[in-house]
């Protein structure tokens, strides 16, 4: 059955290998997701990986999203880098433009933009960084994917000034705080490791738009899409179960 009268989609970070270094199992997880967030070369990926991931997404009719991050290969883009807002705007334009060019070489295009790691977190914590990202996204005339939270309306108002649609996402495997933000990875239990806990969080999001927070409270999250990860055999199997639960109600 379709839950909540509006089917939640599944998105996944992909194309994060580069050179001889292998990251993730894109070939295995791509058939089970709706949207592929493809790294653009700064936190991970390279032109060949980007090309191959675009090809793979096209083969499975998966929507392509640009996944720009800070220039931090060693830290996988999870370290915040101090930049001016103009520098952030230009950095995002540069990365998205590279992926868009590789898409056009295969007669396709990007469908949305989702920042990565520390840039994503900074965007959700600083209106200035959010505005800098929105200005970049506006040039590509696609939606921006951000974290669903209690402040959805605030972000909608800012983005609307630049005619940028927003896609709100929730995370299948992350523990939430009472304010709707993700528990920092530096804190214990920030990532849900139990298959039961992850499937239960997805079920609640689909049926009632709620999640249980670290303190035990239940909060509303108005999300359009759920982020999943497919880094190993166990996580790929879990993505399959998540997809089944969304499309069949777990039956």
Curated annotation (Swiss-Prot):
ATP-binding as a keyword? Answer: yes
Entry GO MF terms: 5-oxoprolinase (ATP-hydrolyzing) activity; ATP binding
Annotated catalysed reactions:
5-oxo-L-proline + ATP + 2 H2O = L-glutamate + ADP + phosphate + H(+)
Q: EC no.?
A: 3.5.2.9
Q: Which Gene3D superfamilies match?
A: Glycoside hydrolase/deacetylase (3.20.20.370)
Protein's GO biological process? carbohydrate metabolic process
Matches recorded under InterPro entries? Glyco_hydro/deAcase_b/a-brl, LamB/YcsF/PxpA-like
Is Transcription regulation one of the keywords?
Answer: no
Say what the protein does: Catalyzes the cleavage of 5-oxoproline to form L-glutamate coupled to the hydrolysis of ATP to ADP and inorganic phosphate.
Family of the protein in this entry: Belongs to the LamB/PxpA family.
Q: What is this protein called?
A: 5-oxoprolinase subunit A
State the species of origin. Vibrio campbellii (strain ATCC BAA-1116)
